[in-house]
Regions:
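Phosphate-group recognition and catalysis centered on beta-loop-alpha active-site segments
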Residues: 1-232
């Protein structure tokens, strides 16, 4: 599977509906977006915990209401895109086609899980279309306890150098369905993960040769900033 990292965002704001729709247009298998919880309990799609990098005003997400965030225009390369707003999870879910995937990266803590599960259950999205991902083991653990029907992956930087067996044991302890890592890893690492019965997913891969190598090793998905290149 080829997954568009924050959508296609070279000339469109990242994590915007426009960037996600551009991804569907080139034939990706899924999109990856980042999500935070607002002060008034809405779930919004934005990578950072504040708006300074992607808007012309700095608001902290968890201290802001949805209405306050919706007043901002998203930027790309320092330029405002008029009427391109920070989307809600509801808005993103509505544009996911049948049979396609959405990788939901949780960028805050476990406080998002209850509203997230409610939002997913109200949407047209089938549970098989959803993959929840997080660097926070507690988020993965509690998600699987609350809603085991959703696939959940623990994100991990291979450069941390941890023993594969220890990492696999942790995956089973928190009931994760698999692991997502960067691409600086060995074939042995991937094989051990897969042999254990866990899924292996790769991020963020923008080179076709690297992507093909990881696929040949058994990677279930490739998350990329260059979906058009990898689809060719």
């Amino acid at each position: 599977m080829i997954i568009a990292h924050r959508g296609i965002s070279f000339d469109l704001p990242e994590n915007s509906l426009s960037a996600f729709n551009a991804s569907w247009a080139v034939g990706v298998d899924g999109i990856e977006g980042d999500f935070h919880l607002t002060r008034d309990g809405s779930i919004v799609c934005i990578h950072d915990d504040n708006t300074s990098r992607v808007c012309n005003k700095n608001l902290v997400i968890c201290n802001s209401t949805l209405q306050e965030l919706k007043e901002l225009n998203l930027q790309c390369e320092g330029k405002d895109h008029l009427n391109i707003k920070i989307p809600t999870l509801t808005e993103v879910l509505k544009i996911v086609p049948s049979g396609k995937k959405i990788f939901i990266e949780i960028k805050c803590g476990v406080e998002i899980l209850s509203p997230l599960i409610k939002e997913l259950s109200r949407s047209k999205i089938n549970s098989t279309q959803v993959v929840i991902i997080s660097f926070d083991r507690q988020v993965v653990k509690e998600l699987k306890e609350m809603a085991p029907e959703y696939k959940a992956l623990l994100l991990y930087s291979y450069k941390e150098g941890r023993e594969v067996s220890s990492l696999i044991n942790e995956m089973f302890d928190i009931k994760a369905d698999g692991i997502g890592t960067d691409n600086e890893l060995s074939k042995e690492f991937v094989e051990k993960v897969i042999i254990s019965g866990l899924e292996y997913h790769s991020w963020t891969i923008d080179n076709a040769d690297t992507a093909n190598q990881l696929i040949s090793w058994g990677s279930n998905s490739i998350t990329t900033n260059e979906p058009e290149l990898l689809i060719q």
